[in-house]
Amino acid sequence: MGKETHNRSNLESEDKGLNMLLEEDARLIIPTLAQKKSLLSILDYPNIYTRSFDLVRLNVDSFESVKSRKDFVLIEVKVTSKKLVDFPIGFFFGLTKNEESLLQGLEGDFLLCLISIHPESRKSIYLDYDALTVRIKNKRIQYQINL
């Protein structure tokens, strides 16, 4: 599979996973860039983190009602199309340093959501930093470098 085809496949899987979550929970929204910046400002985090989360779970009726950190939770989504018999065991994903920083630093205000979109193991789980770290089997650091 070529790189472009692989990237397209990953984006399609992510879209399926996001749609699955949005259908299951009416409190979830896909925030705009401006909304992401507004939420990060409330959390006193810089805008470099705008690409570190995919969804927001509102604890209020609408985005316009968000006034403080208790009004929302940031969510980073990781999707697999692999059949996982004992979900989430066997789930493999990448996590950026920024995503890990938010997960660790915003305990309770940032969650990682793992989703299997395989028809025979269609499930999701939300994890905070502690719940993730106790499940990690292997972890390695990888640098991505552009020249």
State the predicted function of each range:
Residues 1-44:
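Acidic-basic catalytic patches of nuclease active cores, encompassing PD-(D/E)XK
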Residues 25, 59-63, 82:
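Alpha-helix capping/termination and helix-coil
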Residues 35-69:
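Active-site metal-binding core of divalent-cation-utilizing nuclease and nuclease-like domains
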Residues 51, 71-73, 108:
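Residues that flank catalytic or metal-binding motifs in active/ligand-binding sites
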Residues 55-57, 71-83:
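Conserved catalytic cores of phosphodiester-cleaving nucleases, focusing on short active-site segments
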Residues 77-79, 97, 117:
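Residues immediately flanking
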Residues 81-105:
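Mg2+/Mn2+-dependent nuclease catalytic core
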Residues 104-147:
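Domain-level recognition of nuclease-like catalytic cores that cleave nucleotide substrates
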